[in-house]
């Protein structure tokens, strides 16, 4: 273990099942620097479940799905928030912490869902469906949130839709999430045509092949997957719900139909279980690295700003969600 740098060595135990000792020195220097920079700047790192293990397990202070990160962002006492995730997540953290410095390590960390709809699209939808509330997935820009009545995540979408007490809602931008929620509620849902480039690639045939190759495997699917995939799965839920399912049920053999690193991170927490790992990478999440987290903290790079008129309205939509 002589290759392990001393001050980061205690963290290696968390990831040694995935990162060979020979590779650790490539990470350890950045990890040491990040830990020091966090102390110097009173900074906190919020990391989404899709971040790679060396980020998720070694430098992150708060981890979780979009809903968990939004809630935790509200209560942090740090002066600086680094969002190890994609841009809409950093914007949400800024909306909830307007007086704090929020950094995103790479400005190119976008989202296919967020790119699928604009504020003008929502204004046109409101003209077409006057009086129908707009429920917007948090996987959207601040401009889109500002045109919405309330936000939701994959973990609370059904509760949000039903909390409005109306017979019909517009739910955007994820078409598959909207269809999967529509199957669980009597509320009529008008959907948009956005898709997650990770989850839309899973198919029912994939599940059948997994079951054939790995008898007894329990299949967990994210609700951004197509409805026919969700129907073939044993369970569907947000990344937090999938993690909770594994923790609670302890399936001996399990597959998570979501982004690759989610399986890596949960598997590290459950070495007694067998994880089958079909790998659909999110290229946007993978733009976040230890090196650019370090640079963001060292140079105060990529400060997230939101135009005040947009921020106030977008914040209201997020706060309404958090109040449900």
From Swiss-Prot:
Pathway note: Cofactor biosynthesis; NAD(+) biosynthesis; quinolinate from iminoaspartate: step 1/1
Protein name: Quinolinate synthase 2
InterPro entries per record: NadA, NadA_sf, Quinolinate_synth_type2
The enzyme's E.C. designation: 2.5.1.72
Places the protein is found: Cytoplasm
GO CC, alphabetical: cytosol
Cofactor descriptive note: Binds 1 [4Fe-4S] cluster per subunit.
Species name: Mesorhizobium japonicum (strain LMG 29417 / CECT 9101 / MAFF 303099) (Mesorhizobium loti (strain MAFF 303099))
Domain of life: Bacteria
Phylogenetic lineage: Bacteria, Pseudomonadati, Pseudomonadota, Alphaproteobacteria, Hyphomicrobiales
Record-stated family: Belongs to the quinolinate synthase family. Type 2 subfamily.
Cofactor: [4Fe-4S] cluster
Alphabetical keyword list: 4Fe-4S, Cytoplasm, Iron, Iron-sulfur, Metal-binding, Plasmid, Pyridine nucleotide biosynthesis, Transferase
């Amino acid at each position: 273990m002589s290759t392990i740098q001393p001050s980061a060595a205690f963290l290696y135990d968390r990831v040694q099942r995935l990162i060979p000792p020979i590779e650790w020195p490539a990470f350890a220097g950045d990890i040491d620097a990040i830990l020091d920079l966090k102390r110097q700047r009173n900074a906190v790192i919020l990391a989404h479940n899709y971040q790679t293990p060396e980020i998720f397990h070694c430098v992150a202070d708060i981890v979780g799905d979009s809903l968990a990160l939004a809630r935790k962002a509200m209560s942090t006492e740090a002066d600086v928030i680094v969002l190890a995730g994609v841009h809409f997540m950093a914007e949400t953290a800024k909306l909830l912490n307007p007086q704090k410095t929020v950094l995103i390590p790479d400005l190119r960390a976008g989202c296919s869902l967020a790119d699928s709809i604009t504020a003008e699209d929502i204004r046109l939808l409101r003209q077409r469906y006057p009086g129908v509330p707009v429920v917007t997935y948090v996987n959207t820009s601040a401009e889109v949130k500002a045109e919405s009545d309330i936000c939701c995540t994959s973990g609370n979408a059904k509760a949000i839709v039903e909390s409005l007490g109306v017979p019909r809602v517009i739910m955007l931008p994820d078409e598959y999430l909207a269809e999967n929620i529509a199957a669980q509620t009597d509320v009529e849902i008008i959907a948009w045509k956005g898709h997650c480039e990770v989850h839309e690639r899973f198919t029912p045939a994939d599940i059948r092949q997994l079951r054939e190759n790995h008898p007894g495997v329990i299949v967990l699917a994210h609700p951004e997957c197509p409805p026919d995939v969700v129907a073939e799965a044993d369970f569907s839920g947000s990344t937090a719900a999938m993690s909770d399912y594994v923790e609670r049920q302890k399936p001996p053999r399990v597959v998570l139909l979501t982004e690759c690193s989610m399986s890596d991170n949960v598997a590290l927490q459950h070495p007694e279980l067998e994880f089958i790992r079909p790998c659909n990478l999110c290229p946007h999440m993978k733009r976040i690295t230890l090196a650019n987290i370090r640079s963001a903290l060292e140079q105060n790079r990529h400060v997230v700003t939101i135009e005040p008129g947009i921020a106030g309205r977008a914040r209201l939509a997020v706060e309404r969600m958090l109040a449900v």
